[in-house]
């Protein structure tokens, strides 16, 4: 499958196993992937590299996925990058905060390639105007 072959996703998660699983799933869908092990590193990559999508864990050291989202949405150049937050539990408070800050969607860990693909299709079609 290569419907996302010209797209780059940054995966920000402090657990290398989670990054690897998400990366493998994204590559299976055709994405090129970059990785960050914390929020500060993610922001550095975002400021230096063009990405089409950010998938960030809600809970990370230095800067959480929520803080990265807030920083991106406050930046005139970066504000349109689609952001999917990942979390272990779908707590209403966290989801509401993410929505208030402008997250595009969320995934609850663990998730499979089918669920990831479903969320990606929705986000990419809605936010980037590309029908898949």
PLM segments and residue spans:
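Active-site beta3 strand of CheY-like receiver
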Residues: 49-55, 60
């Amino acid at each position: 499958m290569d419907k996302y072959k010209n797209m780059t996703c940054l995966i920000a998660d402090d657990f290398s196993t989670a990054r690897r699983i998400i990366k493998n799933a994204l590559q299976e869908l055709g994405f090129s992937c970059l990785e960050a092990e914390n929020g500060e590193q993610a922001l550095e990559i975002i400021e230096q590299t063009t990405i089409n999508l950010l998938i960030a864990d809600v809970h990370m050291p230095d800067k959480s996925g929520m803080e990265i989202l807030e920083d991106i949405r406050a930046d005139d150049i970066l504000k349109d990058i689609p952001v999917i937050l990942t979390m272990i539990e779908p707590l209403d408070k966290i989801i509401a905060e993410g929505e208030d800050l402008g997250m595009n969607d969320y995934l609850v860990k663990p998730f499979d390639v089918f669920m990831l693909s479903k969320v990606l299709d929705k986000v990419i079609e809605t936010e980037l105007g590309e029908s898949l």
